[in-house]
């Protein structure tokens, strides 16, 4: 049925051109190295969690994305429209997981480092003051909205290019943030905190601010503006 509808909606030549484009050989995605040691975020996030989160969970998304893209490439080359369309959820889930975690690792920094000191000046500081009235208000609002996510997902501080403001947004599962430029992301999947904080999300959310990389947030905001 999907194949029949697709063929009716688009000329055959157009479909062949589109599928040929998708079948272009791509390099495999790889797990990015952490910019710090697994125990660098302790006591806020344990070394055990960081090791499992990075080497097992993130690696699974990378593997899933590579497998889905390989299947899509084959389906596209074969003109198998139904299979190509059916792969979209896997591409979204695993691709989102890879993107989200790659951003997440970089917006964290070692305990006690210069990067985790709450800024008192700069572009990010000024924007937070203007949009939230200060960092404590930002933390309170972002923690509340992230904790309220039903099931798994992500809490984001994103920059809205239309309004030129920082806004708090949540996304379900591994959906990437598309409506805003990601500035800070917080993983609220259980694998990010359960071994250490059990089911007490507020404790995890309060602790993670001790290792937020404000220098990375400053850099992302400057690039977004």
Curated annotation (Swiss-Prot):
InterPro entries recorded: Fe/Mn_Superoxide_Dismutase (IPR050265), Mn/Fe_SOD (IPR001189), Mn/Fe_SOD_BS (IPR019833), Mn/Fe_SOD_C (IPR019832), Mn/Fe_SOD_N (IPR019831), Mn/Fe_SOD_N_sf (IPR036324), SOD_C_sf (IPR036314)
Return the transit peptide range from the UniProt record.
Answer: 1-27
* Binding residue positions for Mn(2+): 53, 101, 187, 191
Catalyzed reactions per annotation = 2 superoxide + 2 H(+) = H2O2 + O2
Between which residues do disulfide bridges form? none
Gene Ontology biological process: removal of superoxide radicals; symbiont defense to host-produced reactive oxygen species
Picking any one GO molecular function of the record gives: manganese ion binding
Phenotype upon knockout is: Decreases cellular superoxide dismutase activity. Sensitive to thermal stress, and menadione (induces oxidative stress). Decreases virulence in a mouse model of infection.
Superkingdom of this entry's organism? Eukaryota
Question: What's noted on cofactor binding?
Answer: Binds 1 Mn(2+) ion per subunit.
Its keywords, alphabetically, are: Antioxidant, Cytoplasm, Manganese, Metal-binding, Mitochondrion, Oxidoreductase, Transit peptide
What's an example GO cellular component term for this entry? cytosol
Keyword Transport in annotation: no
Cofactor (UniProt): Mn(2+)
Does the keyword section mention Cytoplasm?
yes
- First-level EC class: oxidoreductase
Q: Which PANTHER family match?
A: SUPEROXIDE DISMUTASE 2 (PTHR11404), SUPEROXIDE DISMUTASE [MN], MITOCHONDRIAL (PTHR11404:SF6)
Query: What task does this protein carry out?
Result: Destroys radicals which are normally produced within the cells and which are toxic to biological systems.
* Record protein name field: Superoxide dismutase [Mn], mitochondrial
- Can you name the source organism? Cryptococcus neoformans var. grubii serotype A (strain H99 / ATCC 208821 / CBS 10515 / FGSC 9487)
Q: What is the lineage of its organism?
A: Eukaryota, Fungi, Dikarya, Basidiomycota, Agaricomycotina
């Amino acid at each position: 049925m999907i194949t029949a509808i697709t063929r009716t909606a688009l000329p055959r030549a157009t479909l062949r051109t589109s599928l040929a484009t998708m079948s272009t050989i791509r390099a495999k995605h790889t797990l990015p190295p952490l910019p710090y040691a697994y125990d660098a975020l302790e006591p806020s996030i344990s070394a055990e969690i960081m090791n499992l989160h990075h080497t097992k969970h993130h690696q699974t998304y990378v593997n899933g994305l590579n497998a889905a893209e390989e299947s899509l490439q084959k389906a596209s080359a074969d003109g198998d429209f139904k299979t190509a369309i059916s792969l979209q959820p896997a591409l979204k889930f695993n691709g989102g997981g890879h993107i989200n975690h790659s951003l997440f690792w970089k917006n964290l920094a070692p305990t006690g480092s210069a990067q985790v000191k709450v800024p008192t000046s700069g572009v990010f500081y000024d924007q937070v003051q203007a949009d939230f009235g200060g960092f404590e208000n930002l933390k309170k609002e972002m923690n509340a909205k992230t904790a309220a996510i039903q099931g798994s997902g992500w809490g984001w501080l994103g920059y809205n290019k239309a309004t030129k403001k920082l806004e708090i947004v949540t996304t379900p599962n591994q959906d990437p943030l598309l409506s805003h430029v990601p500035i800070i992301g917080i993983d609220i999947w259980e694998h990010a905190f359960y071994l250490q904080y059990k089911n007490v999300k507020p404790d995890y959310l309060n602790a993670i601010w001790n290792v937020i990389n404000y220098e990375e947030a400053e850099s992302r905001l400057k690039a977004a503006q």
